Amino acid sequence: MKSRLKSYRRKKLGLATVIVFCSLCFLFGFYGSTLLSQNVPRVKPRLRMLDMVENGEEEASSMPHGVTGEESIGSIPFQVLSWRPRAIYFPNFATAEQCQAIIERAKVNLKPSALALRKGETAENTKGTRTSSGTFISASEESTGALDFVERKIARATMIPRSHGESFNILRYELGQKYDSHYDVFNPTEYGPQSSQRIASFLLYLSDVEEGGETMFPFENGSNMGIGYDYKQCIGLKVKPRKGDGLLFYSVFPNGTIDQTSLHGSCPVTKGEKWVATKWIRDQDQEE
């Protein structure tokens, strides 16, 4: 009887010891992790923004409002407008002063906009397709640094090296001028072999437009593709130009095939005028 009682007490004592030991481990782990975590900076939840990090340095918190700098982290707010095509809108991408500086630089060199002709097309039978005027300017040719700033920011927003971009095409659309629906990508079956391909386009709106002048995507989300679409119609998803805002859209899928829903155009300006800086981005380095 006594031996059974001793055995029972040993089992009871052993169970109590295990419970106490586990409790101490829990408390040590809980408070230990709390103390250790006090020296670790808190990570704020990410908003729907693109982080810009330069020089490989990353800060845990953003800079105060109104402060900027080349060695700082910043954020580029954006809004997804469409997944078919992939179109992203960037409000306040450039300042009004930067936009005006770009316009002033481009004004003196404007010429009627030209078209890349497909097989069978001529300047005569495509007359009226694109009625704007424009000029090509590289970032290094603009003395105020506005285009250089925009080009670097586009590279950070797209995560594509700036050397993959063509020179800026600065365009002016006056009353009634427009650009019928078209693709920025060059289909080899229509244009012949290409040494590199346009994969994305970035539009920086340099002015407000009182009426008209929207960038439109008639095939957005697959709409209007089977109705015998007239390429002069201004229908589908429309983006109203606002000074300083940017629009990015992709012409190809990640596998390199053409996104048919990236068809787009510029609606006729019905009041005022429209200024825009276009940056075409290619799949290969353009400086080689």
Swiss-Prot record:
Enzyme class: oxidoreductase
One Pfam family named in its UniProt record: 2OG-FeII_Oxy_3
One of the record's GO cellular component terms: Golgi medial cisterna
Cofactor note (record): Binds 1 Fe(2+) ion per subunit.
Transmembrane segments: 13-33
Residues engaged in binding 2-oxoglutarate: 274
InterPro entries: Oxoglu/Fe-dep_dioxygenase_dom (IPR005123), P4HA-like (IPR045054), Pro_4_hyd_alph (IPR006620), Pro_4_hyd_alph_FE2OG_OXY (IPR044862)
Name the UniProt record assigns to this protein: Probable prolyl 4-hydroxylase 9
Keyword Iron in record: yes
Keyword Transmembrane: yes
